[in-house]
Amino acid sequence: MLATLIIGLREGLEAALIVGIVAAFLKRSGRSLRPLAIGVAAAVLLSILVGVLLEALQTALPQSQQEALETVIGAVAVVFVTTMILWMRTHGRDMHHQLEARSEAALGRGGSLALAGMAFLAVLKEGFETAVFLLATMQAETSGALGLLGAVIGILAAGALGWGLYQGGIRFNLSRFFTITGVFLVLVAAGLVLNVLRTAHEAGWITIGQRQMFDLSWLVPAGSIRAAVITGV
């Protein structure tokens, strides 16, 4: 639950910031917010559909193929979170200016339709990453219901924070927030790597190094917060 909550909060706030920056630009320009709303709504619905389809596909597959699909999804999630953290460290400070420039270019190029498309692609990227990352993390959770609950709480909290930032009623250090959550996401990614190795073994893709050398499970009691942080799941 802790991992999915952090993922939902971080990814949700990134998406909320994108929407808020573009909305503020449109408001200052005296433009309608309708194209933005249409693009965002379409991206959110498509992201949810991707997650549902991946989960349905995995459930319909035989056990060995389920493990193979879990391995692929987990590996993709690790790549996503790694590139996301690196991108935020190098481009996070310029995100505001980049989005405003892209919004202005979209309006000049194709008006409302181009802006809706830009908003759709920007939010879809975040939504697709979130869907894959949450699915991979929930596969490693002992309780799927708790994992889903954590994701919902994180996304709702991100939406509330994003709205507060847009309205100007909430102010906090975004750089520090993304740094702290980035550390937790590195731990989550490390846990996903372990889960990818496990599912790859169960799928028959890895057949070496299977002998247990020692057991340190007593250091991280199952279900504890310490276990969630240390194992990344």
Predicted regions and their residues:
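Multi-pass alpha-helical transmembrane bundle typical of ion/small-solute transporters
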Residues: 1-233
